[in-house]
């Protein structure tokens, strides 16, 4: 996949300790889709899904590989995630390679890239997917804890009969919970199947 370095959407090509390669590309270049289908040999439908901006969480097994699409946190400067800021992580894995594409940087991808660059991190594509999901779920858990803290604060205000003070927080928290459920709810089935697929 060395040819990718001459493609406008190229971001990095890293080698895992087990010998598999990881190609990471940006979807904001029209050449990315054609490169994925013509040079890497991905099925045209898979290549199209890997560059689509509007994706829903899903998993598709194709031949000897697996495509996983997930919604990830895109944290703001204050470390808080918002449903409207969530972006897609698009991952293709097969026996010898990982291909990912992005519209915006997300921490799980950046952290894995740093680990692999330093000779650490996952050794195989299956390990890569497991580590990526683990990092992703850690970020989700942190945001859920923040929401729980907000709910507890609202509960305290209501107990003290400070309804007027609680109302704005109630509306914001309800909106956030609904938004996260819309994006994260479909991932339950995807993550269950993906954990089985890489075993």
Tell me the role of every PLM-derived stretch.
Residues 1-197:
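Peripheral, non-transmembrane regulatory/ligand-interaction domains of membrane transport proteins
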């Amino acid at each position: 996949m060395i040819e990718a370095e001459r493609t406008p959407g190229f971001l990095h090509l890293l080698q895992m300790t087990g010998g598999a390669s990881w190609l990471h590309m940006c979807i904001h270049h029209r050449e990315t889709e054609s490169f994925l289908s013509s040079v890497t040999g991905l099925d045209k439908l898979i290549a199209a899904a890997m560059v689509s901006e509007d994706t829903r969480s899903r998993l598709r097994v194709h031949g000897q590989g697996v495509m996983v699409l997930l919604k990830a946190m895109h944290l703001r400067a204050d470390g808080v995630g918002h449903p409207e800021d969530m972006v897609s992580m698009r991952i293709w894995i097969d026996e010898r390679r990982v291909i990912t594409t992005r519209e915006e940087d997300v921490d799980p991808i950046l952290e894995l890239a740093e680990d692999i660059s330093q000779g650490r991190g996952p050794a195989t594509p299956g390990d890569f997917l497991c580590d990526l999901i683990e990092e992703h779920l850690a970020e989700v858990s942190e945001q859920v804890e923040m929401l729980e803290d907000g709910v507890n604060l609202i509960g305290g205000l209501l107990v003290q009969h400070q309804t007027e003070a609680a109302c704005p927080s109630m509306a914001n928290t309800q909106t956030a919970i609904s938004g996260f459920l819309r994006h994260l709810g479909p991932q339950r089935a995807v993550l269950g199947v993906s954990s089985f697929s890489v075993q």
